[in-house]
Amino acid sequence: SSMYCILVTGVPAAGKSIMAEAVAERLKLPVISKDRIKELLFDSVGFRSRKEKVNLGIAAMEIMYYAAAQLMRAGLPFILENNFEYSSRSGMQALLDEYNYAALTLTLTGDYRAIYQRFLERESSPDRHRGHVVNDCYPEREERGTEERRNPHGETKAAGISYEDFVQGIERRGFDAFSVGGRQIKIDTTDFSKIDA
């Protein structure tokens, strides 16, 4: 099939969005990012509990698939950026089958220790969207409107996840083992400066 899409996936903080943007720039393709959709939902809808946050994540996934299906209907190539996991396989496979699309999967992985360090730095970075970091309430009510809430040292800092839990989550959910058949390229992003996009 000449119709194809590129799936950029892999472990948390492996650099999926940077990679997706680089490939998009080079191939002049649109990128649909589940995290970006999630951020739009965080800002426009918000959440007041962990459950509501999870529901926005599910909604973001549905919107991502909807957009992908529209591009497939038009026979256009595109990039999907998402932390695909074992449980996403059937939904993605069904789309590929329905529209007779081939997928090239770029799986970003590397030394878990180094990537875990990057994960911790990202979670406490002022540039990280707060909706990803907090679990109870976003926008954060008490400090709304002040610069205070962007303070990475505030008490709403990410509940620290241990290295063991980080690795266990990757293995249990299959972040670096996801596959829908087709061509798959594993990219080691332990050291970003060594990657030749």
Label the model's feature ranges:
Residues 12:
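The conserved Walker
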Residues 36-38, 109-114, 191-193:
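Conserved nucleotide-binding/hydrolysis micro-motifs of P-loop NTPases
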Residues 99-121, 187:
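Conserved phosphate-donor/acceptor-positioning beta-strand/loop module used by diverse small-molecule
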